[in-house]
Amino acid sequence: KSNNLAQYELQVEELVDKELEVFKAMYLQETKIKYLIIIGDYISEISRKVEKNKEDNTIETAKFLKYIRKLDEKTLEEISEELNLSNESDALVIPYMMIFKCMAESIGAESLWAPGTNVSDGIAFHYAQKNNMIRVEHDFEADVLSAARNLSERYMSYTPHIDALTQMATLIFDTMKKVHGLGRRERLLLQVAAILHDCGKYISFANGPSCSYDIIMASEIIGLTHKEREIIANTVLYNTWPLPDYEDLADKLDHDSYLTVAKLSAILRVSNAMDRSHKQKFKNVKAAVKGRELVITIETMDDIALEKALFDAKTAYFENVFSIKPVIKEKRVYG
């Protein structure tokens, strides 16, 4: 192996190691990883060489690293021959190997799994699912909500309030289905917005809404597009701030997305006001649209003067968006 190639490999390792250290500090901390899933070019070829008789594509990390170090002593042409690659001078082989090696060493997983898929498979699957060409049993919405909850926990959001708010927002959304005309996907976006609405307070109490917006836009939430993250981030922002005219947001949102933000933020505002004290005072909450009113029936043993006052203050925006006035119908419960 030439000195230039050895120096190149060292530079790649240093660069990748630095990024992995930041990733571990932010996302893993003391978490023990059992399996590291690797997709992409060359990993399937390496997997077949390391574990020749296995059918589940799993590799013991120690065996994997031993084989990578063996390849590391070879030239590019020798590596290509070892892995039976069609292109003997593929310049990406070495960087891929270095990335695989750094990840396996840094993450410290017990085993690696190479499912044999790549990004192209994901694009094809997404197209087929979107156009109802295949039936999917896996609940991808649960993955989105799980990723959102992990992000919420990282920024120390108060879980009991998050759960209560998510349930309330979902109840109002479902009750208003014929009024707002939104679908299942927008329901998911509302739930994610409810989960993440307070994450910015970890950075600043005074500028919580704008910090929440920045956190959401800077975070890759599995299963969401950039446009959907923009809708969620603006829903969270205008849960607190007044919603500007469309012309002021036209550089961020198209007209349909703007209307979605208006509807979701109106629902989130009213839902948030129902648990403003963060004490989950309401039990057996029910909602129904009656004429021009959204009647929310609650049972409580507590004083809800604060919630009622803030609720009344939030209803004007909701009524402006939907032409329906939310009202609380209280049932006293004595224990």
Regions found by a protein language model. Name each.
Residues 43, 119-120, 301-303, 333:
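Short, glycine-/Ser/Thr-/acidic-enriched flexible segments
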Residues 110, 322-335:
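A short amphipathic beta-strand at an alpha->beta junction
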Residues 270-271, 314:
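Amphipathic alpha-helical domain-onset/packing element
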